[in-house]
Amino acid sequence: MELHTLKATPGSRKAKHRVGRGHAAGKGKQAGRGQSGQTKRSTVRLGFEGGQLPLFRRIPKRGFNNVNHVEYQTVNLVDLENKYSTGEVVSYETLLAKGLIKRNLPVKILAKGTLTKKLTIEIPTLSQSAKTAIEKVGGTIIEVK
């Protein structure tokens, strides 16, 4: 006896019954699904509760999506302190190069943490507290559109 000559015992491996393939196959016509009705057909759609008002329609609608909403990537003063040295320029390109931002979205600098280095900021959007913190250290903010 060798592995490549092994065979299953006759009758131990039964072929699966293919239903709905005609009378001669033994499972034709109703294919084991009984008389006509909901259970004979395909499954009910997702969220269907047998005719009862479904949950997604029972719960009230809330809110709206503002078409003018702008999502910003945020960079904190702590990040600038850690990644930049004194006198460097902070721009969209340098932020991308240093891995502080990833997506192609506008950037906003926020005032979390402290800043001790003089930096030149070329980012259009800053929080008011970040602006004052940068100017207090002696950094400059260049207006960019």
UniProtKB/Swiss-Prot annotation:
InterPro entries: Ribosomal_uL15, Ribosomal_uL15/eL18, Ribosomal_uL15/eL18_sf, Ribosomal_uL15_bac-type, Ribosomal_uL15_CS. Residues 1-42 are annotated as: Disordered. GO terms for molecular function: rRNA binding; structural constituent of ribosome. Pfam families: Ribosomal_L27A. Gene3D superfamilies: 3.100.10.10. Residues 13-26 have a biased composition (Basic residues). Part of the 50S ribosomal subunit. Binds to the 23S rRNA. Belongs to the universal ribosomal protein uL15 family. PANTHER family: 50S RIBOSOMAL PROTEIN L15, LARGE RIBOSOMAL SUBUNIT PROTEIN UL15M. This is Large ribosomal subunit protein uL15.
